[in-house]
């Protein structure tokens, strides 16, 4: 699944800050502090970031799905 453009619950646009969130998380910053700095205050929006899987190498789950599909074509 790709990162959603909007929060599933409230509809706020959240994708505009995802790349910065991802970069800072990969640098080792605390997700709580990053979300606070980015202005993501609502818990429904915060859970969209926290629950989205980003591997230690920066790969997202969609990258793994695509690689899996290509092996079996």
Swiss-Prot record:
Self-association state and partner proteins as the record states: Part of the RNA polymerase complex. Forms an Rpo3-Rpo10-Rpo11-Rpo12 complex upon coexpression.
Q: Give the catalytic activity.
A: RNA(n) + a ribonucleoside 5'-triphosphate = RNA(n+1) + diphosphate
The alphabetized UniProt keywords are: Cytoplasm, DNA-directed RNA polymerase, Metal-binding, Nucleotidyltransferase, Transcription, Transferase, Zinc
Q: Which residues bind Zn(2+)?
A: 7, 10, 44-45
Q: Which GO terms describe its biological process?
A: DNA-templated transcription
Note the NCBIfam families from the entry: PRK04016.1
Q: Which Pfam families match?
A: RNA_pol_N
Cofactor(s) annotated in UniProt: Zn(2+)
From which domain of life does this come?
Answer: Archaea
Tell me the protein's name. Answer: DNA-directed RNA polymerase subunit Rpo10
**UniProt cross-references to HAMAP family, sorted A to Z:** RNApol_arch_Rpo10
Query: How and how many cofactors are bound, per the record note?
Result: Binds 1 zinc ion.
- Described function: DNA-dependent RNA polymerase (RNAP) catalyzes the transcription of DNA into RNA using the four ribonucleoside triphosphates as substrates.
